[in-house]
Amino acid sequence: GLSPLGKAAVPALEEAGILLDVSHLNDAGFRDVLEAARKPFVASHSNARAVCPHLRNLEDWQIREMVRRRCLIGLNFSNGFLRNDGEKADFSHILRHTEHFLTLEAGDCLALGSDFDGTSLPPCLDSCEKMLDLGAALAAAFGRETAENILWRNAQAFFRANLP
């Protein structure tokens, strides 16, 4: 969880207009943020633990709470966050996580988080140029409007509403 200083920092950060990111927190730290936060926050690169049991992926109760608070959840493209068998992920794994988020009513909270900073990426997303392919896969699976919401609209709306 958060230290006493960390708990005290949450409202100070919010007051300063700094968005909190819970992607690297354990479950106890997440609960501490829920207790201290008064504004929406982000999980900049997190997937669904129900689909892949990585400890930094979000539990369903965390997703529901983020939906309730109108937070933003960025899909993580890292292999280990998409599947747990050591094999390379593909678009089907990203779509499974997306579908799970959508079943939890997170359609307005979901965005792209990526994690392009040196992690192990699946071949289907090992460069920014392949975002067009991801957009096509999302549109084919969930429709163009949902795909566009995930690709840019949700993030744009969140940042417009929550940044000074």
Role assignments for model-derived ranges:
Residues 1-42, 55-70, 92-110:
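Histidine/acidic residue-rich metal-binding segments in metalloenzymes
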Residues 31-37, 53-58, 83-96, 116-132, ...:
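Histidine/acidic-residue-rich catalytic or RNA/ligand-binding cores of hydrolases
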Residues 18, 23-30, 46-49, 78-80, ...:
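Active-site beta-loop-alpha junctions enriched in small/polar residues
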Residues 1, 47-52:
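Short helix/strand-bridging catalytic loops that position acidic/His residues to coordinate divalent metals
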Residues 126-164:
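Mid-to-C-terminal alpha-helical segments outside catalytic/metal-binding sites
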